[in-house]
């Protein structure tokens, strides 16, 4: 790190998005402790895993996984809120790279031709400044070399926020979008 980076860090220190501890050199977005405590699912190692079963019959699917366990008020929620609502687009790239780095040794990405991020309505994209799904896809692509096709799917209907909806309500909210 250069002297300029040290000076920058002095005036603009970086903090962990989970525990708010000041980040050390070499840490990005998450401190090492929070990074190691992130609840990984291990689904990518399971044939016909819970994520795949949840999506069966809804659309044609090769494979699916969830990288982290999400629960209300857990650390993953804090990370996703920082990504979606606090303007931390680089966090999405970081998470995509982390996911790809951890899943790639298992062969999970073999046979995958493209990464297609979930589209965001233009109104939400303007408000947020970016599509968090595109940021994750960019991070995945950076490690795997798999190309990202951002414009393969288009969202033409605006939907209200789903943060206070149950699973069924969420599913119904995005029908025909």
Regions found by a protein language model. Give the residues of each.
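Glycine-rich phosphate/pyrophosphate-handling loop used in enzymes and phosphotransfer proteins
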Residues: 1-177
